[in-house]
Amino acid sequence: PAICVIINVQVVKEIDVLIDYLEYLVQLKPKSDRTILIQNDQHTKEGFLYEQEVKKYMATAIEEDLFEVYYQPLYDLKEKRYRTMEALSRLRHPSLGMISPEVFIGIAEKHGQIAKLGYLQFRKVCKFIKEHPQIMEKIESIKYNLSPLELLKSGYSKKLLRTIEEFDIPFSYFQFEITETVATEYSEA
């Protein structure tokens, strides 16, 4: 398929921003073999600027460990009890508010920040388990999401296992799930 994008270059002054904008436009394309038309309209520009702002904030958020972990309990209808919790990463931007995990995880994967972000979050989960042993008496495990890019990083899995040992937590407390963002791309390749 052919992609044609027309951009008013007077709006984009720096080549790096132009390249980022073109990459942003290409990621908007639908997956089909037909001709692709991507609107270069105000809505698209606002989406691009939003992502650029989040991208700028990511380095600070990782460096200062500003990500939060929310725990979502999962209820078993048959057993009539909570069996597990899912650890979910969240990011609050000072002016944009809550950033969708789909946005910040995609940016972290694209810019090589996902392993550092994931490890910071994993340590928080281990600390939470260690500080709240009464919770683990009531549930069986905590689900933790991993990006395929984390798993492909040499030594990363061993680092997670060492962290579990460091906090003296049974390995059985964890269920690891692979996120869909990059996993989908691998399955389509």
Task: Pin down the residues of each PLM region.
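Conserved beta-strand termini and adjacent loop/short-helix elements that scaffold enzyme active sites
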Residues: I7, I38-D41, Q72, T179
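Active-site core of bacterial EAL-family cyclic-dinucleotide phosphodiesterase domains
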Residues: H43-I107, N145
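Conserved helix-loop-beta segment at the catalytic/binding core of cyclic-nucleotide signaling proteins
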Residues: P1
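C-di-GMP signaling machinery
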Residues: V12-E68, A108-G112, E150-S157
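Nucleotide second-messenger and two-component phosphorelay signaling modules
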Residues: K31-S32, T60, E64, D76-K78, ...
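Catalytic core of bacterial c-di-GMP phosphodiesterases, primarily the EAL and HD-GYP domains
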Residues: I7-I15, R81-E86, Q113-A189
